[in-house]
Amino acid sequence: KGRLIAFDFAERKLLYPSLVLVGLLYNVAIWVDKFMFWYFPPTSEPIIGGLRASLIYDLPVFLSYLSIIPGMAVFLVRIETDFVEYYDKFYDAVRSGGSLEYIESMRDEMVYAIQQGLGEIAKIQTLAVLVTFVAGPALLDALGISSLYLPLLHVQVVGAGLQVGLMAILNVFFYLDQRRI
């Protein structure tokens, strides 16, 4: 109260080791392949000091992460708005003693919003993957990267698309985590 900056999240009663572990493992999974390419001398070059870059890996990874922009937009609209709207109504009704009919209706809407959101993310990401597969050879050629790296781009695009789906599912699970109620 009246503080400009608060570190209440670090209080022991608000610290959830399982959530910390999930976040840590999620981020390690995202970054481990990059560190492998950056710090394996045959696939990387020194940039400044201990920083390294891998031209053959970094550009396909960058392109694959560009391909998730449509899926992230759908995620933001469907999960972070539609689902959260019904989530809030559901828990407000539960806490304030709403009718069983209304609570069940909000639960059904919440489930429907999740189904719609995940379905739309899957459709949009599949389309983004297919477009990247088709445009991949031209993209690599325009960037001066050998077409031998096309399979790497394909794997990265599919992986990035799956990452969007995993992030959406984890987000729903985090919302439904009842420790914070």
Where are these regions (language model features)?
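Alpha-helical transmembrane segments of integral membrane proteins
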Residues: 10, 14, 18-22, 120, ...
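Lipid-exposed faces of alpha-helical membrane segments in multi-pass integral membrane proteins
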Residues: 21, 25-28, 67, 123-131, ...
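Short runs within selected transmembrane alpha-helices of multi-pass transporters and secretion channels
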Residues: 1, 132-134, 151-181
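Transmembrane helical elements of multi-pass membrane transporters/channels
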Residues: 1-80
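Short juxtamembrane and helix-loop transition motifs at transmembrane-helix boundaries
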Residues: 113-119, 144-151, 171-176
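Specific pore-lining/lateral-gate transmembrane helices of multi-pass inner-membrane transport
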Residues: 58-140
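Hydrophobic alpha-helical transmembrane segments and immediately flanking/interface helices
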Residues: 39-59, 128-149, 157
